[in-house]
């Protein structure tokens, strides 16, 4: 539970397709007997704005129309996502955060938030992330969105629009997450095989697995937020912005 001086708050920020159930996907780090445990720490992980698991997203009701936003959902930035977490912190009356931790998109959001938290934050752990998204990553993200847009259901006003495209998008993403030598080793084939390769079935499995639990609208929104990530925008550049994070 939260101690009297709020010195035991651990705040995790989930990645692109993650959710607020941090102990489920980071069980080696968060849990009863983990480094960050519930007996010693007050652990928070909220679903990000735009996420398919909660908060407001493209399937939420647009108050102007009374119907879901779908393709009219506003473009988000990591700065917007960080501000939504800051609003939550203020609502919860959390005065300080001992450790803020996030990976990938979560790391980008954590960096943005660390900039604004100032002395309220003691430690930040940023994993597999960056202060500014590179053209290389933007290219991978665009290829994934092209896969979604190529699905003939994309453009239709229903929650499952773009599902098959999302499967292909996930396959593209998996190639960026894995090292070529790792795939060459783990998906190695016998010389006799002509079809049905392990690498192909692995990517199809990963695509199908994600599409069963996630929606293309959130994938689109959050990869767009990743594209525009730049902690130095309007702050004198990346180096100047990072210098303010103590």
Question: What spans do the regions from the language model cover?
Answer:
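N-terminal cap/lid subdomain of alpha/beta-hydrolase-fold enzymes
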Residues: 2-63
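Structured loop/turn residues at beta-strand edges in well-structured enzyme cores
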Residues: 5, 92-95, 119, 243
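A short alpha->loop->secondary-structure connector
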Residues: 62-67, 121
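Conserved acidic catalytic loop of the alpha/beta-hydrolase fold
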Residues: 66-75, 79-99, 108
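Conserved hydrolase catalytic core segment
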Residues: 95-137
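Alpha/beta-hydrolase-fold enzymes
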Residues: 120-121, 126-209
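Alpha/beta-hydrolase fold catalytic core
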Residues: 192-246
């Amino acid at each position: 539970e939260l101690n009297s001086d709020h010195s035991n708050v651990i705040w995790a920020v989930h990645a692109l397709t993650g959710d607020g159930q941090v102990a489920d996907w980071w069980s080696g780090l968060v849990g009863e007997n983990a480094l960050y445990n519930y007996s010693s720490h007050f652990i928070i992980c909220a679903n990000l704005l735009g996420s398919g698991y909660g908060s407001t997203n493209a399937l939420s009701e647009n108050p102007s129309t009374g119907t879901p936003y779908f393709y009219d959902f506003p473009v988000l930035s990591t700065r917007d996502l960080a501000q939504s977490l800051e609003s939550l912190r203020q609502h919860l009356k959390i005065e300080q955060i001992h450790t803020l931790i996030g990976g990938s998109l979560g790391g980008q959001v954590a960096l943005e938030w660390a900039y604004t938290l100032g002395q309220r934050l003691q430690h930040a752990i940023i994993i597999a992330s960056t202060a500014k998204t590179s053209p290389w990553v933007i290219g991978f993200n665009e290829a994934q969105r092209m896969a979604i847009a190529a699905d003939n259901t994309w453009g239709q006003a229903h929650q499952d629009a773009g599902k098959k495209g999302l499967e292909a998008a996930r396959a593209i993403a998996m190639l960026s997450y894995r090292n070529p030598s790792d795939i060459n080793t783990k998906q190695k084939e016998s010389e006799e095989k002509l079809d049905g390769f392990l690498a192909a079935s692995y990517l199809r499995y990963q695509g199908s697995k994600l599409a069963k639990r996630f929606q293309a609208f959130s994938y689109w929104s959050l990869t767009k937020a990743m594209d525009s990530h730049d902690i130095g925008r309007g702050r004198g550049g990346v180096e100047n912005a990072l210098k303010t994070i103590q």
